[in-house]
Amino acid sequence: MNLIKMSDIDLSGKRVLIREDLNVPIKDGMITSDQRLQAALPTIKSALDSGAAVIVLSHLGRPEEGKYEKKFSLEPVADYLRKNLEYPVRFVKDYLSGVDVNPGELAVCENVRFNPGEKSNDESLAKKLANLCDVFVMDAFGTAHRAQASTYGVAQYAPVAVSGPLLIRELEALNQVLKAPKKPIVAIVGGAKVSSKLSLLKQLVGMVDVLIPGGGIANTFLKAQGFEIGISLYEPDLLDEARHILILAKEKGCQIPLPTDVVVGKTFSETCPAFNKSLSNVAADDMILDIGPETIRDYVDLIHEANTIIWNGPVGVFEFPQFAYGTRAIAIAIAESNAFSIAGGGDTLAAVDLYDLNQQISYISTGGGAFLECLEGKTLPAVAILQERAKHVKTN
């Protein structure tokens, strides 16, 4: 990768603007998962240790652009950073006209999505952000697939634009999977809809040895094969696509195992009783909400045989304990494996957190859409502009 790293640049005394992905879940003003914050801390600390005056940008949630909403404020994130860094930390609401920050200080700016023009990569906004710094550091892998003012535009206009350590680690981990993976490769792709992961599924069948579909995606494959799935979530418009993927997989030598037994309920609720059933016994009023014990054993065996594992999405409704056994078993099997494993996506990260497996997965990606687009073989806009800018950067 032709990228200039933050560590290649002398940051001492410079105004360093870092775009991080600090989009964490917040409930009643409290951060409920600090995974992304923990991932970003080393980059911020490194810049401060280098004697830089550091300014951090991030989005949080999906506010109406240009409109302030307290529930989407980054103030709780600034409080968190204040407690976890041995440097002065200030929260700045109005920053587009300039930020007064000294070397060895951190200024956390309010949600970039409160600025009109952020999503459309408005040139005027991008230039205002670029004027805040001497060096722009793109470290937010989770937003690298978006050509927005704080990810792409600012990198165009900043005096110097470089890649942060977290972004580099993300790209290197994905590169290990995409460029030189050790076989056999097993991918677990769960979630509600085939439509949201259609490109990924097509890409993976030409790349992996085993592709395990889960959740609503698996239901669509089952329906396409003529199985009774009752009132389970599936996509009727994509049955032909599912059949095409199964044919393509056979041509490419990729195995797509489907559940032989499932866990069903009558309603989608936390109090709904769960019943194990073989696939042939699913009733017209059943809702498939997890994989059954026989399928769990089969999938765990496949995972244990892998040398490379890609995990994106749960195989059941793990938010409800009675339908969480499949996702939990898959997660533990990946954690116990000696294979190189990479996990990404919001629900996947939530499962890793829930089962306390953060230290046992080889690499946990902070990205959702960016993670998927990388696996699909797409070029990320924010990475592309950094590569372009790298051609004109003088390093130490």
Curated annotation (Swiss-Prot):
<dbReference type="InterPro" id="IPR036043">
    <property type="entry name" value="Phosphoglycerate_kinase_sf"/>
</dbReference>
<dbReference type="GO" id="GO:0006096">
    <property type="term" value="P:glycolytic process"/>
</dbReference>
<comment type="subunit">
    <text>Monomer.</text>
</comment>
<keyword id="KW-0547">Nucleotide-binding</keyword>
<feature type="binding site">
    <location>
        <position position="146"/>
    </location>
    <ligand>
        <name>substrate</name>
    </ligand>
</feature>
<dbReference type="GO" id="GO:0043531">
    <property type="term" value="F:ADP binding"/>
</dbReference>
<comment type="similarity">
    <text>Belongs to the phosphoglycerate kinase family.</text>
</comment>
<dbReference type="Pfam" id="PF00162">
    <property type="entry name" value="PGK"/>
</dbReference>
<dbReference type="GO" id="GO:0005829">
    <property type="term" value="C:cytosol"/>
</dbReference>
<keyword id="KW-0808">Transferase</keyword>
<protein>
    <recommendedName>
        <fullName>Phosphoglycerate kinase</fullName>
        <ecNumber>2.7.2.3</ecNumber>
    </recommendedName>
</protein>
<feature type="binding site">
    <location>
        <position position="113"/>
    </location>
    <ligand>
        <name>substrate</name>
    </ligand>
</feature>
<feature type="binding site">
    <location>
        <begin position="345"/>
        <end position="348"/>
    </location>
    <ligand>
        <name>ATP</name>
    </ligand>
</feature>
<keyword id="KW-0067">ATP-binding</keyword>
<dbReference type="GO" id="GO:0004618">
    <property type="term" value="F:phosphoglycerate kinase activity"/>
</dbReference>
<dbReference type="InterPro" id="IPR015911">
    <property type="entry name" value="Phosphoglycerate_kinase_CS"/>
</dbReference>
<feature type="binding site">
    <location>
        <position position="197"/>
    </location>
    <ligand>
        <name>ATP</name>
    </ligand>
</feature>
<feature type="binding site">
    <location>
        <position position="319"/>
    </location>
    <ligand>
        <name>ATP</name>
    </ligand>
</feature>
<dbReference type="GO" id="GO:0006094">
    <property type="term" value="P:gluconeogenesis"/>
</dbReference>
<comment type="pathway">
    <text>Carbohydrate degradation; glycolysis; pyruvate from D-glyceraldehyde 3-phosphate: step 2/5.</text>
</comment>
<keyword id="KW-0418">Kinase</keyword>
<keyword id="KW-0963">Cytoplasm</keyword>
<dbReference type="InterPro" id="IPR001576">
    <property type="entry name" value="Phosphoglycerate_kinase"/>
</dbReference>
<feature type="binding site">
    <location>
        <begin position="21"/>
        <end position="23"/>
    </location>
    <ligand>
        <name>substrate</name>
    </ligand>
</feature>
<feature type="binding site">
    <location>
        <begin position="59"/>
        <end position="62"/>
    </location>
    <ligand>
        <name>substrate</name>
    </ligand>
</feature>
<keyword id="KW-0324">Glycolysis</keyword>
<dbReference type="GO" id="GO:0005524">
    <property type="term" value="F:ATP binding"/>
</dbReference>
<feature type="binding site">
    <location>
        <position position="36"/>
    </location>
    <ligand>
        <name>substrate</name>
    </ligand>
</feature>
<dbReference type="InterPro" id="IPR015824">
    <property type="entry name" value="Phosphoglycerate_kinase_N"/>
</dbReference>
